[in-house]
Amino acid sequence: VGSEMCIRDRDRKVYDGAAYFLEAADWLLCKLTGKQIRSASFALCKGLWREKQGYPEAGLFAEIAPELENIPEQKLGAKNALYIYPWEKAGTLTEEAAEELKLCADTIVTGAQMDAHAGLPALGITDAGKVLLVVGTSTGIIFQGKSRKEIQGLCSIADYCDLPELIGYAAGQASTGDCLEWFIKNSVPGYCQEQAREAGKDIFSWLSEQAEKLKPGQNGLLALDWWNGNRSCLADQELSGLILGLGLETRPEEIYRALLEACAFGVKRIFKEVEQYGIPLKEIHACGGITQKNPLFMQIYADVTGKKIIVHRCEQAPALGMAIYAAAALPSVKGGYGSGAEEGPQTEAVRHAALSAASANMQSRDFEVYTPQEEYHRVYESMGEEFDRLYDYFGMENHVMKKLKQRQW
């Protein structure tokens, strides 16, 4: 809904001329099946849709702008669409799609799923208590709960958006790899680049090697990971990054390690906020490009959070996850893990059992476990208290970051 409103504000001609707006994934579903299909997961997390209630009452949209009162029917095509979950059959390929993709015409198509969320079954996450940590340019944190808790500052809270019978929660950090890349592009001196070249390494690997020689707290630095604002749990994009403790003796690898630690402290703070609501986060599964390229970073995550980090060497976790969703939708009589009844209503328990079975048999099994180092964890516990003070002070008490951004000439 937010995207449609943005288009309305920026280009009213496009908005008025559009018959309706579709998620790219929903457009693909329509092309593949020839049906008006909508992804229930996308609608839940991005469109304020609910399975039993549908979209919010017209009055909510009318409060934003009178002409938006009937946006679900007028611009989202909600009236005649079928809302399908990723573990449900949406249809089969049309003849044209089957011919173009060189697949059988009876190949089933399931509901679409958001990219990071699709990795859940690929990593064996089909129950509450497990966390999916997707580390890339930014970081996605996806977990499940057995009951609904209204946790402030999360990206989404939606019933059954990821897995049957469970409440899906999503949080995140707006800058992880982007923050590190910014530092390397703008603040790493030439002599570091030269030494990296002489060693036959890229600058990321070289800096990680140098940073690994440092003990926690040895650099005397503490940073906030808000280089692109705070996504969770302050949900404030006007906040900015901070490094405390810089001096004339500070070296590039010390700043680099401080940024790695800041990202880990940010994840721990999110975990802390969530666990206060009674949602246990016991098992951390990580994937994404950085997780396989930077062992130091993964060890810092473990040392800071005090939790084991299970890093999966699965380069296409979302693709594998969608294959698992499809296998759960396919009846066992046809080689899948679903119930014998291809059509007709099924309980959420039956769907959950099918998805769990598919995941157990098809999930990634190539992984490495990073275990917290007790000595380092004790130091990070103390540093974490100072991180929380900075977090609370600059995030909620002192608005100097926003004031600096607002000052214009």
Map each language-model feature to its residues:
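Short loop-beta-helix segment that forms the pyridoxal 5′-phosphate
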Residues: 16-18, 22, 80-81, 101-112
